[in-house]
Amino acid sequence: HIIILGDGMADHPVERLGGKTLLQYAHTPYMDMLAKKGKTGRLITVPDGFLPGSEVANSSIMGYDQNEVYEGRGPLEAASIGYELKPTDLALRCNIINVQDGKIITHNGGNLETEDADVLIKYLNETLGKDFPDVEFVTGIQYRHLLVVHHGNKHIECAPPHDHPNENWHELLVKPILPESEIEEGHISCSDTAALLNELIIKSKELLENHPFNIERKKRGERMANLIWPWGGGYRPHMLTLSQMYPQIKKGSVISAVDLIRGIGHYAGLRNIIVEGATGLSDTNYEGKAAAAIQALKDGDDFVYVHVEASDEAGHDGDLELKLKTIEYLDQRLIKPIVDEVSTWTEPVCIS
């Protein structure tokens, strides 16, 4: 069984496209063929009471009940980079974003490269870590990083930066959501956690804007990566592996460029396959992912989860033409070679 997930492909009808959605408008003969020959229906990937997000949708698709396992994306991303959380640790996704004139301009810091972001994250960990010993910044991928607050409280409201472009970032700062009287053992209050995170956010702006990397960016007329934005926090989740939930899955893999998906794979007991050139953007190695999925099945995997982030990133950037391209790339450069290969096998392969 192979699941191919084009993250963020779904969208609203677009007037410029004659009232069609991007999936309706895009040229996708292989997706169309699979839909025609297979079974189609509506799948609720975000249960009632949960905000739409990749951590919810992808783990739901794998069969996890969010009421039992949901802890936000931070702990999943921690697992993917090998950070071992303690039970009292609060793990948050930490974007490096761009703000101008008090507003969020981009959620990705001007498309940061991982190597550049690593310099900034290590700098923040060194400088802010001196004043805040219970805080750790850990490098992830591109603009997506990890912030760990030892003894932090998860009952806080953090706004995902990609949901608030051109909004005043001061009005979106972290807020507590539990009364002061409700204290969890081993954790500081949610008010203290919110105050700590807001202080880190505010202090990061001056530190980042005065870093040589951003000074050079500003000289070149490029957007600075000038503010941290923590969100998606939670504690270490308690998840069964897919093999424990579904005994027919003896061996499985996940293929993704995104830490979050790799983290889900870690807790699901899946092998993470790293594909060279897989970027999470439109220039990702579609062919390499297809080849890796085919090889995993040949090697005896019962289940392969192939995740492609490119369409989601194009959507967040508001780039309609690029998003159309990513959907068509997925069809022609990833789905096509997989379908063409497995259709020659004697053993049937289910493709979702």
Kindly label every feature range from the protein language model.
Residues Q24-H27, G140, L197, V254-A257, ...:
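Active-site-proximal structural scaffolding
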Residues H1-I3:
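Extreme N-terminal starter segment of soluble prokaryotic enzymes
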Residues P230, Y235-L322:
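Anion-binding catalytic surfaces of enzymes that hydrolyze or transfer phosphate/sulfate esters
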Residues S191, L320, R333-P337:
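Gly/His-enriched, cation/cofactor- and phosphate-binding structural elements
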